[in-house]
């Protein structure tokens, strides 16, 4: 299934049904009086979170949604039936914005959660409502009220426990494929990953959801390479795995580029717990590993892990560190920098 994390939709709730003009006509009842029923209420438009979805691709092919008009009132004081609702099924983590794509309407984070986006118009009054002491046989009724019409943006922010960040070709997809059942595209060229992937990692009877987002470049927070869209997917993560490729000549610069983008993007991304790790160490000698690790530790002020997804070296240590930090963040409600021996 193709991935789409943003979509524009046009919705309209149903109009209310018209009230009826009707009079009671029965044998032996000379003056039956009015008995026109009210119109039914128009259908609503709802957003509903369902399980098993992780994309908004359906809304690329259908953008217009209109609920049904309420039924018209009938004689014998019968109210028209309510118009059928329209339900927009969305994945967990969907945010819905006004047409300006800035004003947040709702943030849907749990399966089964729903939100009414547009309320159907009320039905019109039948002629029974207009009877009074001076008008015993009113011949008027109200039309139903018009439904609401809105243009909305749907934006998906994946819900994961930990996120993988780094420059293109930092080995994020290879790491995800090695520790989960996810099958992201892996190749020896930049920007192999074009959209986020999710996988479930397991270690020591513990498990957590891991999100791999496409590589970040300078200017990502301003939308360069769609970086601002990708950064949104890690806003909900407890922990960030910041991977730096062992093949980078200047590992400190590679680290700082991504850190600068996190700070510029805002939303407290730069304050999240960070596990810094050098990937692809199977390409280095022991001496080269030591040099790059020491350089990064001086720049970050943190212990720096090293691993190889190809050889499997230190993969379990990475997962244990991630699982431990996720538990710590959840328990304490604060972010802490990882410390490894």
From Swiss-Prot:
Domain of life: Bacteria
Keywords: Cytoplasm, GTP-binding, Hydrolase, Magnesium, Metal-binding, Nucleotide-binding
Requisite cofactors: Mg(2+)
EC number(s) on file: 3.6.5.-
Main location: cytoplasm
Keyword Metal-binding listed: yes
GO molecular function: GTP binding; GTPase activity; magnesium ion binding
Gene3D superfamilies noted in UniProt: GTP1/OBG domain, P-loop containing nucleotide triphosphate hydrolases
Enzyme class: hydrolase
OBG-type G domain sequence ranges: 160-327
Entry GO CC: cytoplasm
Domain (Obg) ranges: 1-159
Cellular localization per UniProt: Cytoplasm
One Gene Ontology biological process: ribosome biogenesis
Keyword Transferase: no
Positions that bind GTP: 166-173, 191-195, 212-215, 279-282, 308-310
Similarity remark: Belongs to the TRAFAC class OBG-HflX-like GTPase superfamily. OBG GTPase family.
Alphabetical list of PANTHER family matching this protein: DEVELOPMENTALLY REGULATED GTP-BINDING PROTEIN-RELATED, MITOCHONDRIAL RIBOSOME-ASSOCIATED GTPASE 2
Quaternary structure annotation from Swiss-Prot or TrEMBL: Monomer.
Matches recorded under NCBIfam families: Obg_CgtA, PRK12297.1, PRK12299.1
Protein name, per record: GTPase Obg
Species whose genome carries this gene: Bartonella quintana (strain Toulouse)
Gene name of the record: obg
